[in-house]
Amino acid sequence: MENTFKLLFETIEERKRNPLPESYTNYLFSKGEDKILKKIGEECTEVIIASKNNDKEELVKEMVDVLYHCFVLLAEKNIPLEDIMEEVTERNGKLSRVGDRREIDTL
């Protein structure tokens, strides 16, 4: 799975370095950070709706869209995927105490 994410991220970085006409990724880069952030927000909303509708297939698709747009944002901000992977590795296995976290209000 890590390799799949790496390949996707490398493709996104390649589009940033060498734009292809008609590429959606290049469209996002050309519109800039605000457009990328807007798309992340839209896709996160679609994740919420799919989850509330108990639509597993749609939820998976929308999660992929969120990941893709987050990868575009990382590339836009020149943050390598390795930085994310290192942070995940560092957090993996850490014990987190519920009391250390702020309360989440229910809907």
Curated annotation (Swiss-Prot):
Return one Gene Ontology term, BP aspect: L-histidine biosynthetic process
Give the metabolic or biological pathway: Amino-acid biosynthesis; L-histidine biosynthesis; L-histidine from 5-phospho-alpha-D-ribose 1-diphosphate: step 2/9
The domain of life is Bacteria
Q: Name one Pfam family in it.
A: PRA-PH
Q: Which GO terms describe its cellular component?
A: cytoplasm
> For this UniProt entry, what is the primary localization, expressed as one broad class?
cytoplasm
Say yes or no: keyword Hydrolase present: yes
Name the family the entry cites.
Belongs to the PRA-PH family.
Protein name per Swiss-Prot or TrEMBL: Phosphoribosyl-ATP pyrophosphatase
Q: Which organism is it from?
A: Bacillus anthracis
Tell me the gene name.
Answer: hisE
